[in-house]
Amino acid sequence: MVCLLAQVISSVTIAQSDTAAKGYQTPKFNFLRFKEDWSSLKGVDRKDLQPSERIKYIELSKNGNNWVSFGGHLRSRFENHRNFAFGAPADADDSFILYRALFHADWHLGEQLRIFSEIKHADIGSRDLPGRARPIDEDELEVQQLFIDYTFDIDADSTLTFRVGRQEYGFGKSRLISALPWANALRHWDGITGILNTPQFNVNFFYSSFNPVDQDGFNNSDSDNQLAGIYATQKLAANSGIEYYWLRTEREDVTFNGTSGDENRDTFGIRHWGIFSNRLDYEVEGAYQTGDVGTGSVSAFMFTGEVIYAVPGASNSKLSFAVDYASGDDEAAGEVNTFNQLFPLGHAYFGFIDLVGRQNILDISAAYRTRISDRTNVRVAIHNFFRADDADALYNAGGGVVRAGDASASSDIGREIDLTLSYKLSNQVTGSLGLSLIHISEPTRPY
């Protein structure tokens, strides 16, 4: 199975380093655009700003407390697939283009009130692979985000913000909760969020309903798919920290390896990152899940660990090794031991072909990243996939079953290699080209 990817991304944003020499700084690009703070442009003479910066901070009052920031994000991606789904049942080869446009307005009305709005148009050309144009591919003219913030000052260094409306979530390294920037249509939720910011802690507490894509109309929240929780980040030092989280998911009519019913699942997790030395970084994350699916109780867990080594004498070159494990069921029906990956950005951790997700999986991987010029970066990654438990299924990046569990089959899934080249055309435009190949062990093939 082979996948060729090429994409061009354009964003109205400015790299921080380009403006620091002028005596002011602008924020680095964040896919969650509402996290960008452009208030640093307050008081800067507009004649000193770059043309694209002038729409990022427009004063609406003489004192500068009322202002608006406009921005956007355009992406076009070409995909070429060969032997998709290993040549069965049909339409194994195809090429198509995906398009996505995002435009936002960030209104600041005084120091406490804020309104953030973002519209989206996601479309796809003729996709003849199984599933055709899927909900993750197509969502035409939709309100992606529309929320109101009200911020209280607790003291000179701490604030408490209440957010109500349609919003994107992205916590930690996006292993469990992500707006899914790789997918064309993205994710979003309707809900309420509280955000506590102190010099040492950032705490999000939230209650929401997921918004599935309605390809025939506007998206509406699904009261049968709810997400709530608390996500706290503690700063330990400049290069280290700890995250603690509790995530509550409630869904109707789900099935895990033969156990069906309504799901009520709690995820308790912790993530820690830091440095061993000037050249060696590390990260670990673990989570345990409890609850019930129908009449079956839930007991599942995940763990990931990664070390990153900065290669001496090489320009921004890094070599990394990682282990990802997520539990599976040891027998069908009854107690559920399959980890639920929730709303992940699995594409970033289990290969770009998206055959594998964070459920019933062991992935041993290595990656090498290097900068070959000021504008060009190359990354190569190798994944070795195994099912954690032979009696459970192989699940893809979306949580769908690729192959049902079979205790008599080998746990060996196969190997994937991903090669990516990215080129920065300008501060606002980046292009990338990727090639991914996967070799699947014969017993794992779904057909």
Region locations from a protein language model:
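N-terminal periplasmic/intermembrane-space "pro-region" immediately following the signal or transit peptide
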Residues: 5-93, 315-322
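Extracellular/periplasmic loop regions
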Residues: 23-41, 45-49, 258, 285, ...
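Extracytoplasmic loops and strand-loop junctions of Gram-negative outer membrane beta-barrel proteins
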Residues: 52-56, 84-89, 129-132, 174-177, ...
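Outer-membrane beta-barrel architecture
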Residues: 56-60, 102-104, 147-149, 193-195, ...
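Surface-exposed loop and membrane-interface regions of Gram-negative outer-membrane beta-barrel proteins
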Residues: 80-99, 107-158, 175-178, 255-257, ...
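Signature for the C-terminal beta-barrel architecture of outer-membrane proteins
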Residues: 154-162, 175-332, 391, 404-419, ...
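Conserved C-terminal beta-signal and adjacent last beta-strands/turns
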Residues: 366, 380, 414-425, 429-436
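Single conserved hydrophobic/aromatic residue that forms the stacking wall/gate
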Residues: 438-447
